[in-house]
């Protein structure tokens, strides 16, 4: 938050300025076994939404990208692996995320940008179905 605010005056002087926050699929619905992580990503989502509106008047685009789990050493070496990891993803690479970040920086994209086919489908379901459906989906994906 502090770094984003510190950059604001510099962004105002830039051509086509953009802030791309790293949110997560975990910011769509709280993830069992990952409550703290989900809460932090919900905060990123809220910050993105607020600044997207607030800074638009200054010509600064603020968006986020929302990947599910990414295949990195951190994920591979985790002592605990939540059941949802294997069901929702873990097959995206850092290059996939970098490509989405580049797209967000260089194209006119939505405020929230899901990454990966499975999560894009879940996010679409969340928009068109009652919220109870998202809860049921998360319960199913998180079962042990």
Give the location of each predicted region.
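Active-site helix of classical SDR
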Residues: 4, 40
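Catalytic Tyr-X3-Lys helix of short-chain dehydrogenase/reductase
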Residues: 8, 43, 48-56, 61
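Residue(s) in the substrate-gating loop at a strand-loop-helix junction
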Residues: 24
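Conserved catalytic-site region of short-chain dehydrogenase/reductase
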Residues: 27-29
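Active-site loop immediately N-terminal to the catalytic Tyr-X3-Lys motif
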Residues: 31-35
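SDR active-site lid
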Residues: 53-117
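Short-chain dehydrogenase/reductase
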Residues: 112-126, 138
């Amino acid at each position: 938050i502090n770094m984003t605010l510190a950059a604001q005056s510099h962004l105002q002087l830039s051509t086509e300025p953009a802030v791309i926050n790293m949110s997560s699929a975990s910011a769509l619905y709280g993830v069992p076994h990952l409550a703290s992580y989900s809460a932090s990503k919900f905060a990123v989502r809220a910050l993105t939404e607020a600044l997207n509106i607030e800074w638009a008047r200054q010509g600064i685009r603020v968006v986020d990208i929302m990947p599910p789990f990414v295949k990195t050493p951190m994920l591979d070496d985790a002592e605990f692996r939540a059941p949802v990891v294997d069901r929702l993803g873990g097959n995206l690479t850092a290059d996939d995320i970098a490509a989405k970040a580049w797209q967000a920086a260089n194209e006119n994209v939505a405020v929230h940008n899901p990454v990966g086919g499975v999560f894009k489908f879940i996010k679409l379901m969340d928009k068109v179905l009652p919220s109870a459906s998202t809860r049921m989906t998360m319960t199913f994906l998180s079962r042990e």
